[in-house]
């Protein structure tokens, strides 16, 4: 009887753990989702979002519907970084609506307040260096308020750069030089540097790892929208030819 009771208890415990793991796994996004190569793939994914987009919508209408959804989206409190994901995605959309690439970034202080926000401006300003994170940090460092957060060019502890997309090599190194932590909303399996951090020269790798460098705690819907904004250039083939 005692053995039977123990066995039943073990079965119950395993079933509970399995169900909990299943719920966690179901909340994650299939890694394959974060690879998009064609306009057709992108449109299918846009239509699948709860934004009311249909395949025949003009590009401008698709983006406006996405913008309306983002504007009314309430960050999920189960995900500690969802409010920053929304803010970064809103910046990314601003760039897209201007004809630029869909990446945005925000700077967060140690209290969790967003103190700066910006977006990719490469196309708009004809500047190869103006990735979202680069634009964010440069404009912040030029601002009057930056003085209280900086020691010459290194930021005081507790600041975080949150990007809508996984930073590239240039941006990851720039963030590392400032001493800020790095977080991002959507992974970049084909171009992100965080997941390839071991390939950095040893000095830059060690510098980057002195701070937190990680995927943000974001809802699946924010991750997917960040990905779709990143690849929105496929809609009209914008950028250098």
Language-model regions, residue ranges each:
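Positively charged n-region of N-terminal signal peptides that target proteins for export
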Residues: 1-4
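Bacterial N-terminal signal peptides
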Residues: 7-16
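Zinc-dependent deaminase
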Residues: 20-94, 167, 173-241
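Short beta-strand scaffold segments in enzyme catalytic cores
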Residues: 103-109
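Short, glycine-anchored, charge-dense loop/turn motifs used at functional sites
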Residues: 109-115
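Short beta->alpha transition motifs characteristic of CBS
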Residues: 115-123, 211-216
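A short, polar/charged loop-to-alpha-helix boundary motif
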Residues: 121-135
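Mobile, glycine- and charge-enriched loop segments
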Residues: 136-165
């Amino acid at each position: 009887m005692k053995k039977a009771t123990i066995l039943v208890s073990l079965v119950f415990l395993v079933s509970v753990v399995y169900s909990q793991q299943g719920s966690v796994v179901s909340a994650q996004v299939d890694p394959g989702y974060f690879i998009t190569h064609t306009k057709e793939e992108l449109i299918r994914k846009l239509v699948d979002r709860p934004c009311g987009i249909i395949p025949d919508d003009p590009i401008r209408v698709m983006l406006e519907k996405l913008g309306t959804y983002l504007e009314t989206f309430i960050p999920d409190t189960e995900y500690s970084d969802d409010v920053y994901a929304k803010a970064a995605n809103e910046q990314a959309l601003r760039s897209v609506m201007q004809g630029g690439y869909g990446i945005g970034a925000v700077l967060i202080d140690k209290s969790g307040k967003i103190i700066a926000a910006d977006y990719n401006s490469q196309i708009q300003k004809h500047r190869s260096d103006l990735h979202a994170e680069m634009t964010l940090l440069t404009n912040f460092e030029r601002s009057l308020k930056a003085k209280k957060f900086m020691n010459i060019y290194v930021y005081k502890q507790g600041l975080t750069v949150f990007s809508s997309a996984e930073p590239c090599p240039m941006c990851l190194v720039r963030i590392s030089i400032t001493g800020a932590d790095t977080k991002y909303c959507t992974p970049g399996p084909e171009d992100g540097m965080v997941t390839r951090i071991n390939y950095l020269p040893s000095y830059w790798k060690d510098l980057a790892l002195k701070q937190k460098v990680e995927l943000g705690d974001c809802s699946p819907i924010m991750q997917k929208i960040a990905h779709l904004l990143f690849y929105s250039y496929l809609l009209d083939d914008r950028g250098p030819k």
